[in-house]
Amino acid sequence: MREVISIHVGQAGIQIGNACWELFCLEHGIQPDGQMPSDKTIGGGDDAFNTFFSETGAEKHVPRCVFLDLEPTVIDEVRTGTYRQLFHPEQLISGKEDAANNFARGHYTIGKEIVDLCLDRIRKLADQCTGLQGFLVFNSVGGGTGSGLGSLLLERLSVDYGKKSKLGFTVYPSPQVSTAVVEPYNSVLSTHSLLEHTDVAVMLDNEAVYDICRRNLDIERPTYTNLNRLIAQVISSLTASLRFDGALNVDVTEFQTNLVPYPSVIIRPSTPAEKAYHEQLSVAEITNSAFEPASMMAKCDPRHGKYMACCLMYRGDVVPKDVNAAVATIKTKRTIQFVDWCPTGFKCGINYQPPTVVPSGDPAKVMRAVCMISNSTAIAEVFSRIDHKFDLMYAKRAFVHWYVGEGMEEGEFSEVREDLAALEKDYEEVGIEIVEGEGEEEGME
């Protein structure tokens, strides 16, 4: 088997986790108590779903996941919620006091006390796997636990499971909406770890997802439940090929191979868009709509950058012939630009399982959908926004004493800031080299 272990850190990670497992259970016909009635054998009784669920002797299906938080309130909601019987009590780990939106508390002081317990639980899950493929880590980088404990955990996972893939699904601070004053500090500090310790980091941004809910799903005032369910649809599409059989299945390691051109462009900021919901659209139409700026789940305009790589994950009633035609059309468009050293740039996956929707959920039931995950130079916009806010605060050393008081050194701030500046520069250079090349060609003509 090619098992995958999911790790949900902090409030955002846990709430996205709730939405994801709710959806996975519906997709596989697993009830909230973990039972899977035999008459609902989806996919003819194959065991592809065992990549995400382990089976106990009592025929109960238990998610291969761990929920971690430094304070109990959010995890208590899982302990008392609809799916309380689904999870093993040992998989829900909470501390006594929270990280107070402080990266240093999550990473150095309070996080340090709980991290060994977390790794112990992860080790138990890993021991149950016959061929562990990798980890999916869910967190946000604006708060204290997601950023601090999340990056500490990634560092430790790199040591213990060096060769395993690590995919991060990370919620970045939104341009306009802020939940904490110190968000820029936390995000820059934890991006440093994401760069070093994840293989692919998928960026999500509440404001962008909020806009999709409002514009595409006509929800006037989206709640976090709406946002999380939409994010869960995206994650479900990305992992569908691990859980179901399809025509062109995509492995976790294949994301890495296809999205990462060379190591300096490491954060592989993939901006996924889950498309199609209302009318029955053709494959070409859903493919085109996936490339629209309005579909991006991180606030950046892909028209300002160039694509280095792009994975298209189709599900439902889709045949390879239609996909090839749709991709050929995209390649002829002038608005969608690829870097010239990567002319093909497309990786496609097809899965025959159509998207499942949560009863009373927002998206309508559709026959086919596409989820795009891409590496584009436009993502530099996200970093420059965060960097700018970081610089404004750090110039005055505002709030720095809270971090130093928890055992951090001030030098760390400038070190991680330089790292991010280098990343921004990498993305810019990828774009610039190309412009020079185009100029030469015109000169020759």
Swiss-Prot record:
Its needed co-factors are: Mg(2+)
Q: PTM details?
A: Acetylation of alpha chains at Lys-40 stabilizes microtubules and affects affinity and processivity of microtubule motors. This modification has a role in multiple cellular functions, ranging from cell motility, cell cycle progression or cell differentiation to intracellular trafficking and signaling.
* Gene Ontology terms: biological process: microtubule-based process
Its Gene Ontology molecular function terms?
Answer: GTP binding; hydrolase activity; metal ion binding; structural constituent of cytoskeleton
Could you list this entry's UniProt keywords, alphabetically sorted: Acetylation, Cytoplasm, Cytoskeleton, GTP-binding, Hydrolase, Magnesium, Metal-binding, Microtubule, Nucleotide-binding
Q: Which Gene3D superfamilies match?
A: Helix hairpin bin (1.10.287.600), Tubulin/FtsZ, C-terminal domain (3.30.1330.20), Tubulin/FtsZ, GTPase domain (3.40.50.1440)
Where does the record place it? Cytoplasm, Cytoskeleton
Its Gene Ontology cellular component terms are: cytoplasm; microtubule
Q: How does it assemble?
A: Dimer of alpha and beta chains. A typical microtubule is a hollow water-filled tube with an outer diameter of 25 nm and an inner diameter of 15 nM. Alpha-beta heterodimers associate head-to-tail to form protofilaments running lengthwise along the microtubule wall with the beta-tubulin subunit facing the microtubule plus end conferring a structural polarity. Microtubules usually have 13 protofilaments but different protofilament numbers can be found in some organisms and specialized cells.
Q: Which family does it belong to?
A: Belongs to the tubulin family.
Instruction: Give the protein name, as stated in the record.
Output: Tubulin alpha-1 chain
Species source reads Stylonychia lemnae (Ciliate)
